A protein has these predicted regions:
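Hydrophobic, lipid-facing positions within transmembrane beta-strands of outer-membrane proteins
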Residues: 7-9, 39-45, 105-109, 177-181, ...
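Repeated loop/turn-to-beta-strand initiation elements of outer-membrane beta-barrel proteins
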Residues: 54-57, 118-121, 189-195
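Membrane-embedded beta-strand positions of outer-membrane beta-barrel proteins
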Residues: 9-13, 59-61, 109, 123, ...
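Outer-membrane beta-barrel channels and translocator barrels
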Residues: 4, 50-52, 116, 188-190, ...
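Outer-membrane beta-barrel "beta-signal"
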Residues: 185-189, 217-230
């Protein structure tokens, strides 16, 4: 009981913006035409325990969603698509749109450091259990070379029946992990503002998935509010 005497509990909520992307933009992606974040929200409860010399521990449980929509121009981009019931694999040149959406439970374990009575730094690992996942899109306004750069040429148009669609949702991981870095600023006795960056250190796809050749990492920033319950 004495160990919990000086511990605090916070209710937290936030809004996240970011995306799922490779660390380096590959040469096969020539241009990002558009990017639209989804309504990415985070809710949860945080447990904070101070220790000695300004150090402490923060953990908790959060439910959150992360998603985005992008459209890019690509050249010789490896794809596996479906059109008219036929599955086609090869190198695509044209436009690709992508929709990503995930719901998850997240457990962080963060070291904290106090800078005065109001400002707190936080950093450490997190793990997320994915409860809902979606990675879908279409290839359009271009052509696909079957198998290799000199393979048969398949034209893909703009209209729905002329596009090639893909759905890699089942190839996504059920568990993700990474690093969080953030800070809290407590501007009243009970209320505080929060900001953090979460960087997935493992890609969102399973290890045996190779259709997208680059490793895709979830990278998001979150701003929000915290309310001190105890």
């Amino acid at each position: 009981e004495s160990w919990f005497k000086d511990a605090n509990i916070y209710a937290r909520m936030g809004y996240s913006i970011g995306g799922t992307a490779p660390l380096d933009m590959p040469a096969t992606i020539r241009k990002l035409n558009s990017y639209s974040p989804r309504t990415n929200l985070m809710y949860g409860v945080e447990f904070y325990k101070p220790f000695h010399n300004r150090w402490g521990l923060a953990t908790g449980l959060y439910i959150e969603n992360k998603g985005m929509k992008t459209d890019a121009t690509v050249k010789n981009y490896h794809m596996e698509i479906t059109r008219g019931g036929e599955t086609l694999e090869g190198l695509f040149t044209g436009n690709v749109d992508t929709n990503v959406k995930q719901w998850m439970w997240t457990l962080p374990i963060l070291a904290t450091y106090e800078l005065g009575s109001q400002f707190r730094l936080k950093f450490g690992p997190y793990g997320s259990l994915i409860t809902s996942k979606n990675f879908t899109g279409a290839a359009y306004d271009g052509y696909l070379r079957k198998g290799n750069p000199t393979g048969d040429k398949v034209l893909l148009g703009h209209e729905e029946g002329q596009r090639g669609t893909y759905d890699f949702s089942k190839d996504m991981r059920n568990i993700q992990w990474g690093i969080k870095v953030g800070c809290d600023y407590h501007f009243t006795k009970h209320w505080g503002a929060t900001a953090e960056i979460s960087w997935g250190t493992a890609g969102i796809f399973k290890r045996d998935f190779h259709t997208i050749e680059q490793t895709m990492y979830p990278i998001y920033g979150t701003i929000g509010l915290a309310y001190k319950l105890k």
